[in-house]
């Protein structure tokens, strides 16, 4: 695992857990804006950068390593934390453990543990792994699932970006793919969570509301203090990557009030 630090001159501390299946540069716009106000710690998961050896193991290991890293750097509390999708799963566990207090947290389309029978969870894993591999191998499927005219980053050439994304997805090992989906959907949480004073909001894009219904129900039950907020006209993880300025307006509205 690697953690990039931005905005070291700032006093307020932000932990940023990205989603999976996206390279570091997909978050450059958001991180550039956030680092103007925040000392930001951006997590890069194992198995997610070709130049870094190793496989992604689990949400649990990631949270333990992030917590240990920050404490070693003298960080004993965070002013803010953000996690998207798999990153939302990591943030949910970090909050639940209560070992690193957080003042305010945004769980953006965060994945929560399934409560299905074991056999059904194994079948879901098979579906997810096969789906990822099909997208990674087929440019046509990739563009059908994520139309370039909608999901190309601002200022980027669509063909060049999708060439880079297609090549990037092929760098994921079979072990990393399996562990991302299994751990992301089945990570352990304490019941009940540790007592925490964090203000929590769960974001979802309006276009992913149906897919997030189970996650929303879980968060409402597990963190009763959490607010639920829909982002108009957005799909999963679209706001943070494609619209960094708008993302930061939503971010500041919650974090800086």
Q: What label would you give each PLM region?
A:
Residues 41-82:
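Active-site loop/oxyanion-hole signature of alpha/beta-hydrolase fold enzymes
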């Amino acid at each position: 695992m690697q953690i990039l630090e931005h905005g070291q001159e700032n006093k307020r501390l932000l932990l940023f857990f990205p989603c999976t299946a996206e390279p570091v540069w997909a978050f450059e716009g958001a991180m550039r804006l956030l680092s103007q106000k925040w000392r930001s710690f951006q997590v890069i998961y194992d198995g997610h950068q070709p130049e870094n050896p190793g496989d992604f193991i689990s949400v649990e290991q990631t949270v333990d390593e992030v917590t240990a890293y920050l404490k070693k750097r003298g960080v004993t509390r965070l002013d803010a934390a953000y996690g998207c999708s798999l990153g939302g799963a990591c943030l949910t566990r970090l909050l639940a453990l209560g070992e690193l207090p957080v003042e305010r947290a945004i769980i953006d389309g965060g994945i929560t543990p399934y409560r299905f029978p074991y056999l059904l969870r194994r079948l879901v894993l098979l579906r997810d792994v096969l789906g990822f591999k099909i997208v990674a191998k087929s440019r046509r499927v990739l563009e059908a699932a994520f139309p370039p005219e909608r999901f190309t980053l601002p200022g980027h050439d669509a063909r060049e970006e999708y060439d880079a994304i297609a090549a990037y997805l092929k760098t994921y090992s079979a072990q990393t793919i399996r562990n991302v989906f299994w751990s992301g959907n089945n990570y352990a949480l304490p019941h009940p969570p540790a007592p925490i004073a964090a203000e929590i909001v769960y974001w979802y894009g309006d276009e992913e509301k149906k897919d997030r219904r189970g996650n929303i129900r879980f968060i409402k039950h597990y963190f009763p203090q959490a607010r639920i907020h829909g982002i108009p006209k957005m799909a999963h993880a679209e706001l943070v990557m494609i619209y960094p300025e708008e993302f930061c307006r939503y971010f500041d509205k919650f974090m800086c009030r």
